[in-house]
From Swiss-Prot:
It comes from Burkholderia thailandensis (strain ATCC 700388 / DSM 13276 / CCUG 48851 / CIP 106301 / E264). It comes from the Bacteria. It is an enzyme of class 1 (oxidoreductase). FMN binds at residues 61-66, 76-77, 82-83, 105, 140-141, 184, 194. Transmembrane segments: none annotated. This is Pyridoxine/pyridoxamine 5'-phosphate oxidase.
Length: 214
């Protein structure tokens, strides 16, 4: 049997210093994301989304980032899914990007808001036909009796809408407006580099940067 306590990796690919990063965390994120793309990492646009239910119990899942700008980080989903219900109750959430090949993480915390109807319509129209039909066919997070019922629903929706299914009213975008963004670079002996950006209206960039102990 594998001894989990003996599994470890010593990180040594790079370092991270406040003097070397952009004062704007969105620009710095773009730098790191482009490096992840250049390294041809598998699906560098995947991130963990953490939410909390009414009882304070956390849940997490992998979702895909679909847009980043000065307003925040955008993803799309079913508003009636578990995460959608939890965000309706508590709009505070966290995102985590983990690019293991580069020994990097980006942790983002903030408040969730819905994107505009126009943004949701535009992205939905860009999706493959099967994904658009699937958004109608799946009552995400609901208990179903069998996959056969799901596939029958898919055929029904396909027959109803053909090549042009509209965006379902229960499906659309969210934007996480960050209050903090942390960049983490793995270092030897677990003495990792951690730089935390926090919103600061008094700063020229609108953010202040602090180094955190690993």
């Amino acid at each position: 049997m594998t001894t989990l306590a003996d599994l470890r990796t010593n990180y040594s690919r790079a370092s991270l210093d406040a003097a070397d990063v952009n004062p704007n965390p969105f620009v710095q994120f773009d730098v790191w994301f482009k490096e992840a793309l250049s390294a041809q990492l598998p699906e560098p646009n995947t991130m963990t989304l953490a939410t909390v239910d009414e009882a304070g119990r956390p849940s997490a899942r992998i979702v895909l980032i679909k847009g980043v700008d000065e307003r925040g980080f955008v993803f799309f989903t079913n508003y009636e899914s578990r995460k959608g219900r939890e965000l309706a109750h508590n709009p505070n959430a966290a995102l985590l990007f983990y690019w293991i090949e580069l020994e990097r993480q980006v942790r983002i915390e903030g408040r969730i808001e819905k994107t505009t109807e126009e943004e949701s319509d535009r992205y939905f129209a860009s999706r493959p036909l099967g994904s658009r039909i699937g958004a109608w066919a799946s009552e995400q997070s609901a208990v179903i009796e069998s996959r056969a019922l799901l596939e029958a629903r898919e055929k029904e929706i396909s027959a109803r809408f053909g090549e042009n299914p509209p965006r379902p009213p229960h499906w659309g975008g969210y934007r996480l407006v960050p209050s903090t963004i942390e960049f983490w670079q793995g270092r030897p002996s677990r003495l990792h580099d951690r730089l935390l950006y926090t919103r600061d209206a008094a700063s020229a960039s609108g953010w202040r940067i602090a180094r955190l102990a690993p």
